[in-house]
């Protein structure tokens, strides 16, 4: 797809649109954080003052949730298309690492979904803070739960 790359470009959300800024990626946006921002405007500081990245799996969850919660297909599409410059990819080895992490977390009674495991693993591997409103992540290293 045109416009997608794994390199960090500089954009931010403002009034539903991404605008160019001069900051470096610092956060990994979990689908909870993206939805919280899109639906309530909370977490705006994380989306305006810094750069964040996410994967297409989180975008998939966001798109589904927007449709489920009553947004029109075109409105939901416009919102997730705006995330394209923020997409990063993950490798086969990342998938394996994320599933090992998922098993370890399950043994500690923390049940992560496949998408959450990939997101958290990717954030940790890239040195990004994992921004989420999901209470299941509280207390884990590298997690910001505002």
Which role fits each region the language model picked out?
Residues 57-93, 99:
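Active-site-proximal, substrate-binding regions of enzyme catalytic domains
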Residues 50-54, 85-86, 140-146:
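Active-site regions of enzymes building and remodeling cell-envelope glycoconjugates
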Residues 1-55, 65-78:
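Short, well-structured N-terminal submotif of metal-dependent ribonuclease cores
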Residues 125-146:
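A generic hydrophobic-segment detector
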Residues 34-35, 59, 137-138:
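A generic structural signal for short hydrophobic patches within well-formed alpha-helices
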Residues 4, 11, 15-18, 88-129:
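Active-site neighborhoods of divalent-metal-dependent phosphate/nucleic-acid chemistry enzymes
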Residues 32, 56, 92, 134-135:
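Alpha-helix N-cap/helix-start capping motif
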């Amino acid at each position: 797809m045109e416009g997608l790359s794994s390199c960090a470009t500089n954009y931010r959300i403002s009034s539903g649109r991404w605008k160019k800024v001069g900051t470096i990626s610092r956060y990994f946006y979990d689908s909870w954080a993206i939805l919280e921002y899109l639906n309530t405007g909370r977490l705006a500081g994380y989306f305006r003052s810094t750069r964040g990245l996410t994967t297409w799996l989180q975008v998939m969850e966001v798109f589904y949730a927007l449709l489920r919660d009553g947004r029109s297909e075109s409105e939901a599409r416009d919102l997730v298309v705006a995330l394209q410059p923020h997409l990063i990819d993950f490798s086969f080895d990342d998938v394996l690492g994320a599933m090992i992490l998922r098993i370890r977390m399950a043994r500690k009674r923390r049940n992560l979904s496949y998408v959450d495991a990939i997101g958290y693993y990717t954030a940790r591997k890239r040195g990004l803070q994992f921004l989420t409103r999901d209470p299941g992540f509280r207390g884990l290293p590298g997690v910001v739960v505002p």
